[in-house]
UniProtKB/Swiss-Prot annotation:
The keyword Signal applies. Pfam families: IBV_3A. This is Non-structural protein 3a. Involved in resistance to IFN. GO terms for biological process: symbiont-mediated suppression of host innate immune response. InterPro entries: IBV_3A. Residues 1-23 form the signal peptide.
Length: 57
């Protein structure tokens, strides 16, 4: 079964697109986790500051 160069190129491009999409998806998941961690840190900082302000009053 000999394929023409154009169909081979199309298969290569499709595989490359699949790879890019999967990498992109993993990057998005990693970014979401990073954002959640940052939000948790910010929340804990805000809560501790609020507690400090209340204790000063």
């Amino acid at each position: 079964m000999i394929q023409s160069p154009t169909s081979f190129l199309i298969v290569l491009i499709l595989l490359w697109c699949k790879l890019v999409i999967s990498c992109f998806r993993e990057c998005i998941v990693a970014l979401q986790q990073l954002i959640q961690v940052l939000l948790q840190i910010i929340n804990s900082n805000l809560q501790s500051r609020l507690l400090l302000w209340h204790s000063l009053d």
